[in-house]
Amino acid sequence: MKNIVIIITVAVLFNLFGESLQMVPFETYPLNQDDSKYDCLTNGYNPYCQDICKLHNTKEGYCKKFFCICEKLSKENVKFLAEIIDTCNERLDEIL
């Protein structure tokens, strides 16, 4: 009986831990309004990608295969900057 409880507990903890890892992958491409990736010219450390990633609520970013990559970018923040731009454009349309 104790073995079953231990197995169930381990399975539940493993499932919860696995879900949390899926929510924050190590590196993810941030996306523009049209779901395209941000282009960059210099692979490796790249100030432009650093700025893009900071605007997407992450601390670290670099250029990989000529696209910006952000470390630990959550699913909610993949299009974070695009959502802000959309909101601003909607407000401008209302004003004008």
From Swiss-Prot:
Q: List the disulfide bonds.
A: C40-C63, C49-C68, C53-C70
Give the UniProt subcellular location, in the record's own words.
Answer: Secreted
From which domain of life does this come? Eukaryota
Tissue distribution of the protein: Expressed by the venom gland.
Domain statement = Has the structural arrangement of an alpha-helix connected to antiparallel beta-sheets by disulfide bonds (CS-alpha/beta).
Question: Which family, according to UniProt?
Answer: Belongs to the long (3 C-C) scorpion toxin superfamily.
Q: What is this protein called?
A: Neurotoxin 23
What is the organism field in this record? Lychas mucronatus (Chinese swimming scorpion)
